[in-house]
Amino acid sequence: MFEVIGERINTSRKLVQAAVADRDADYIIDDVQKQQEAGANFIDVNAGARIGHETEDMKWLLDTIQPIATVPLTLDSPDPAVLEMAFKMVEKTPMINSISLEKERFDAMMPFLDGKECKVIALCMDDAGMPNSSDDILARAKSLVQELNKIGIPTAAIYVDPLVQPISVESNKGTMVLDAVRAIKALFPEVHITGGLSNISYGLPQRKIINRTFVSLMMDA
């Protein structure tokens, strides 16, 4: 099944940051409703851009969004303390964004996720950086799924992000991801695939056409 994560509630966006700073609930509510009307299956909530204010901003955003949210929320933060606070506030089973194999992030996130009932975005990133082959992606995905399974996260609750990279940098980046996705699905039929699909067209003309084509290929992979 194709699912959409609405990512507009992110304080790295200037208008959202201003709305959060001003506690402009109407702006946030309108944005969330538009994402839901457009078909979002999850609403991502990221309050990390205002340094020193993430906890209070996340709390305000959740208080503002939850009364009108018809879909689950994606709690987006690298800080387990912020996620712990947010997890206790949410009414629907959330998605956590995200864990990776980077040692610092992995070591911080695993204790938080241990025993939690949630969905998890798992980035195919480790301390060596971005993956350079479909085998890299598959190996990292396998490690992430196995480690998350050990702490009670079922495979069906894991959303693997193979880290889509621009074909403007290397023309094989698209086929690399598609090959990896096929291999991941063969190994873990219950796992979900997610990612920043529009990354594929970065730096190129006719981005919408490229994006639509790549989405179709990913859905068929």
Regions found by a protein language model. Give the residues of each.
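Active-site-proximal loop/turn and secondary-structure-junction residues that shape catalytic pockets
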Residues: 9-11, 47-51, 79-81, 100-102, ...
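Glycine-rich anion/phosphate-binding loops
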Residues: 19-29, 98-108, 134-146
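Catalytic beta/alpha-barrel core
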Residues: 44-50, 71-79, 93-104, 124, ...
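N-terminal small/glycine-rich loop or linker at the start of catalytic domains
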Residues: 1-24, 117-131, 199-200
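Catalytic alpha/beta core domains of metabolic enzymes, predominantly
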Residues: 108, 115-221
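Structural preference for beta-strand elements that scaffold enzyme active sites
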Residues: 2-4, 41-44, 70-74, 93-96, ...
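Glycine-rich, proline-tolerant flexible connector loops at the mouths of alpha/beta enzymes
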Residues: 36-71, 164-174
